[in-house]
Amino acid sequence: SINISGTDISKFSDTELDKFRGDNIGIVFQKPHFISSLTINENLKLAKYLSPSKTSGDAKKILESLNIKDKYQQKPNQLSEGEKQRASIALALINSPNLILADEPTSSLDDFNCDNVIKLLKKQAKDHKAQLIVITHDARLKKHFKNNLNL
């Protein structure tokens, strides 16, 4: 069986898995995924709309902590790669997930934004009692985590 947040998801239908993931799992993909015709704000609103049972975070506050609050009304193609990566992190965190999966969350980020992103991910995990799993090749992250698994 596969248990996440005390729920066995191994027998869920595809629809149930989609709903569960939207409510409980925040995913930071290595390459950001957005609906390109929507602004960052609209992408965040859509994520909140698709998971109405969950308490959502404040989009502007999350974007501010990622230093991209001023990009709120821009479309993804108007952002730099680093800004897209940070907006992708906001998208993963907007529904206050119980599990945060971050695949190369600091790719395309400078040192300053790398530190901010890791602090935000760890704070979000602590504040919402969420599990945080980070997959990375980025040596800058090693100092931020006590538990490391090197393969």
Model-derived regions, located:
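Conserved ABC ATPase "signature" region
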Residues: 8, 56-71
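A short, proline-enriched helix->beta-strand linker immediately N-terminal to the Walker B motif
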Residues: 94-98
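Conserved ABC ATPase signature
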Residues: 75-79, 83
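Hydrophobic anchor residue at the start of the ABC signature
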Residues: 89
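Catalytic Walker B motif of ABC-type/P-loop ATPase nucleotide-binding domains
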Residues: 100-103
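Helix N-cap at the start of a conserved alpha-helix in ABC-type nucleotide-binding domains
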Residues: 111-113
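ABC-type ATPase nucleotide-binding domains, specifically the catalytic core motifs of the NBD
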Residues: 38, 42-56, 65
